[in-house]
Amino acid sequence: MDFEKKGYTVLKKVLDQPVANFIYKYFLMKRKIADIFYKNKYIPPNSSEWGIWTDIQVPGTYSVYGDIAMETVLVELKPLMEKITNKNLFETYSYARIYKKGDVLHKHIDRFSCEVSTTLNLGGDPWPIYIEPGIEINLDPGDMLVYRG
């Protein structure tokens, strides 16, 4: 299996297009509402439950930690990830980010609790991920990359 050998594998169409599109539009709407809430001071500027634009990895890009929609996806996809990795996994956290044109997530090492991680494209244009220099992986909406964090 790819994961055992290479440390990553791509799973096509893990989420059906209507499901991926629904979650994608949900996050676009959540970002819009969060922007209104912050600008109109309905919520404190240091609040994070509606999402933030201050993540140091990709500043100025909307992201949200532990959203119930992504926590649900995490739990639902856990059996598939355990099968792919041949490991008993424990959910640690979910994190969603809406990339915009020009955003770059530079090479980094995930925290220790992310021994196995996943990236899931929910919507927008296909975009490349570079696992290692010269290894480009393109994900369409609904596709998922499982990798050693």
Model-derived segments and their meaning:
Residues M1-T85:
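Non-heme Fe(II)/2-oxoglutarate
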Residues Y8, Y93, P128:
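A residue-level signal for beta-strand positions that form part of recognition/binding surfaces
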Residues E76-L80, Y95, S117:
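Generic beta-strand or strand-like secondary-structure segments
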Residues K101-G149:
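Catalytic core of non-heme Fe(II) oxygenases with the double-stranded beta-helix
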Residues N86-Y95:
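A short coil-to-beta-strand element that immediately follows conserved catalytic motifs
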Residues D2-K5, F90, G123:
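A short, polar/charged loop/turn motif at coil->beta-strand junctions and beta-hairpin connectors
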Residues I98:
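Conserved active-site beta-strand element of glycosyltransferases/polysaccharide synthases
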